[in-house]
Amino acid sequence: MNEQYSALRSNVSMLGKVLGETIKDALGEHILERVETIRKLSKSSRAGNDANRQELLTTLQNLSNDELLPVARAFSQFLNLANTAEQYHSISPKGEAASNPEVIARTLRKLKNQPELSEDTIKKAVESLSLELVLTAHPTEITRRTLIHKMVEVNACLKQLDNKDIADYEHNQLMRRLRQLIAQSWHTDEIRKLRPSPVDEAKWGFAVVENSLWQGVPNYLRELNEQLEENLGYKLPVEFVPVRFTSWMGGDRDGNPNVTADITRHVLLLSRWKATDLFLKDIQVLVSELSMVEATPELLALVGEEGAAEPYRYLMKNLRSRLMATQAWLEARLKGEELPKPEGLLTQNEELWEPLYACYQSLQACGMGIIANGDLLDTLRRVKCFGVPLVRIDIRQESTRHTEALGELTRYLGIGDYESWSEADKQAFLIRELNSKRPLLPRNWQPSAETREVLDTCQVIAEAPQGSIAAYVISMAKTPSDVLAVHLLLKEAGIGFAMPVAPLFETLDDLNNANDVMTQLLNIDWYRGLIQGKQMVMIGYSDSAKDAGVMAASWAQYQAQDALIKTCEKAGIELTLFHGRGGSIGRGGAPAHAALLSQPPGSLKGGLRVTEQGEMIRFKYGLPEITVSSLSLYTGAILEANLLPPPELKESWRRIMDELSVISCDLYRGYVRENKDFVPYFRSATPEQELGKLPLGSRPAKRRPTGGVESLRAIPWIFAWTQNRLMLPAWLGAGTALQKVVEDGKQSELEAMCRDWPFFSTRLGMLEMVFAKADLWLAEYYDQRLVDKALWPLGKELRNLQEEDIKVVLAIANDSHLMADLPWIAESIQLRNIYTDPLNVLQAELLHRSRQAEKEGQEPDPRVEQALMVTIAGIAAGMRNTG
């Protein structure tokens, strides 16, 4: 353990030293000394020295406006470098990779040792693997793209420096390169000046594909194949690629008026353009590699006399020409030019696959398997994973937008007001129209701009090549008519295929009603005929936690999934559960392996579909090696969950969870909704108001510009509490409920649940992680600096609650301290705290200065505003999750 961490610590201190030299060169010795003093005070304050803690507070309060920005940037940049070192550590032979034997191999060995599982059963489970990762542009990726590229390069330098055999001059060159990169980062503005547009967000997603996933996916499949051969003597079929990527960037219009039908059309074209660009590079390599002459009669017949001399090259050059023509056409379309489709335009994956696979089969048959299984195999697998669209997109829209559109239409037609009809009347109307052969939309109707936008979006879906749009997600879905309405709007747009439409259940009530809604839908003959035995349902994690608190929400999510699984099984429907998890605990984020094994039995039978959000995309897929490791973790967890499902739930455990849910929800809502002091306290004790100024994502932070906590999106709500280190949404109510059940004499039952039920142990583990990142003295400091004295008692009450919660969680888990079973995470948090604490203290000071100036009617000082943005980004890096 220590030896492993000494490698990480030495990398962190080396990067810190280089950053120090950069600061000295840029700003002079006195600023570096100031930063060093603050760092030492912070370290000593963390070790429990109260006098130094006091001195730390005074030093930061007394910084002049000119010193604010350099100090904030120094600690913020250091945390980015520490994250980079930690990311490298997770894949380094000296780091976790060394002590973490291959996860797939470990899972396969575990499965082979189960007497009830035959090798054939395991093979079948592998063949039915399905993993779809949905990349979302949540405004939580704070770091600018240009800095991410520099950090990827820093990572590459660390990798080369790890090589024992490099010559001195190479070592010196690498160190010089590191110094250049860190200096470039220091002299780059880390805060975006403008909000990214939805197209910028989509380009960020494509950059992740190009820089990491393009290489990572074939590498992961090689790894998987190797482990299967070694452990089961089984080779993966060439066409078997269990992983797909979908994106919400450019498709998610829920609450984001900037995502229009035109934007979606543009992003679809851009995505296809990027795919042709990446495949052209692959094909170029194959043109130069596949110079072989010997080929099967089938391949020779395919190329004819013209290509007989170099049949493989001939096919590759043909494919290259088609890709170039396709790219030129897409480029013209992106510029707004309307050109006729060229001959050979690539629109379907088969058109890419067939010539490549013909070469593959011929090479195998002619004894050149070693060549077939090289770059050619990687390209074939990319065709299966990415294909012509590169990444498919989901469309997401709020249910009320569809209801309003149909209301406007029925009023125009003079048949009543759809919006005011009962659910039964709505369903009768929708089913009648869905069965009707005549169109419903009148030709000369001029709808409102909002309705026009909904109809235009359906038009874009109908026109897009089949397979480029993955699903239509309806947020805030509450009734069967919400789902039928979308099917009707798509039918009216002339869609020629059955598009998966997924209701998203995201509040406590909606989760509790989800099974009733789906049962009603599955009882409609027309609907059963349409879906052809497949249904997708999305479970919302973030909004349910904001609505009811984390304990009640997670139990409602579990029960909704459990009921849906049983209903679909009974109806013979293959259910895909789509998990809308976030990066942070308050939004359902948990280490992937633990989270998947804690779901109800059978929940992964239809594969895993999960959102990967904002900043988590970079932590989990930022480098090809990390992509391999993340995909392997998911693979191991899905196989284990499907083949060794957790036992059916004990009735007594269910009763305890019901009780915990009611108590925790009442306490949570008692504070968040009913305590009149809560919203003013939240607004002053956190940077919630100021977060709106950060140009993070293309989507507004609020659903409605006025209003309390309920109108805030889940992300800024959690982001704000993470900044002041109280982490309130991720624990409020949970500990109090546990304490009440302990007082009722059920502690031993809770301990058994913690031991034997993955769902419950994961909940407690997530609470421990939150408590380890929370910090009560810092939360108290925010109160003292920013909150009206009349509200101090509320802050104290909340902090006391957290202290009590920590005690009860440790008692049930039988641990003496937090994170006892994950010492490396505890170590990582401690390492960061030394750098995050000064940013927190500084942030409270900056908020104080900024609000003071506003109160006095002064213009905000740009130095204060800029430094505030930097502390927000820095604390997010220190906490390793934002919203």
Swiss-Prot record:
Gene3D superfamilies in the cross-refs: Phosphoenolpyruvate/pyruvate domain (1.20.1440.90)
EC number(s) given by UniProt = 4.1.1.31
Q: Which GO annotations describe the biological process of this protein?
A: carbon fixation; oxaloacetate metabolic process; tricarboxylic acid cycle
Q: Which UniProt keywords apply?
A: Carbon dioxide fixation, Lyase, Magnesium
- What cofactor requirement does the entry state? Mg(2+)
Q: Which HAMAP family does the UniProt entry name for this protein?
A: PEPcase_type1 (MF_00595)
Protein name per Swiss-Prot or TrEMBL: Phosphoenolpyruvate carboxylase
**Gene this chain is encoded by:** ppc
